[in-house]
């Protein structure tokens, strides 16, 4: 997130208390927490049907009503086409269109997730050897 002008805000006691707890839990500055919340709120208003999930350091856009993140629907669409995605996965045409519209607006975010998921098994094992088993040796 880019630097912006200082902004003063008065918060309700409830919101202030919540920010204090989240600040202690996440160790993120309250201003960063508010910026994250504002960004997600703006995106959910621009794209009704999109929500966010995951830990603070790796929040992901997902399509509400499906089990799929936006990047997963985009990956399925690019690999199978709309007709197969709609017939083989729990997503409506509206939900697929929503994911594609979100991708069109935030391509960098989704492309990064697609790239991350495209890693080879050997690379995943190198990153997390205790979680990802060694790929079988050929030959």
Feature-to-residue mapping (PLM):
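Intrinsically disordered, low-complexity basic tails/linkers immediately adjacent to helix-turn-helix/homeobox/MYB/SANT
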Residues: 56-64, 114-139
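Short amphipathic alpha-helical segments
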Residues: 9-11, 19, 26-39
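Short, Lys/Arg-enriched anionic-surface-contact patches
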Residues: 1-2, 42-68
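Short Lys/Arg-enriched helix C-cap and helix-to-coil transition segments
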Residues: 48-52, 108-118
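Short, basic interhelical loop/turn and adjoining N-cap
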Residues: 28-29, 87-98
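Short alpha-helical "recognition helix" segments of helix-turn-helix
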Residues: 22, 84-87
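Short, amphipathic alpha-helical "recognition" segments used to contact nucleic acids or chromatin
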Residues: 66-80
């Amino acid at each position: 997130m880019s630097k912006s002008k200082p902004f003063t805000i008065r918060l309700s006691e409830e919101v202030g208390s919540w920010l204090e707890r989240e600040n202690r839990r996440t160790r993120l500055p309250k201003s960063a927490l508010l910026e994250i919340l504002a960004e997600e709120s703006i995106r959910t208003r621009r794209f009704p049907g999109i929500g966010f999930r995951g830990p603070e350091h790796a929040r992901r856009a997902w399509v509400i009503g499906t089990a799929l993140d936006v990047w997963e629907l985009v990956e399925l669409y690019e690999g199978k086409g709309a007709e197969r995605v709609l017939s083989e996965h729990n997503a409506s045409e509206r939900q697929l269109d929503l994911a594609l519209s979100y991708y069109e607006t935030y391509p960098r975010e989704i492309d990064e997730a697609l790239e991350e998921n495209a890693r080879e098994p050997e690379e995943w094992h190198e990153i997390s050897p205790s979680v990802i088993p060694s790929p079988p040796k050929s030959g």
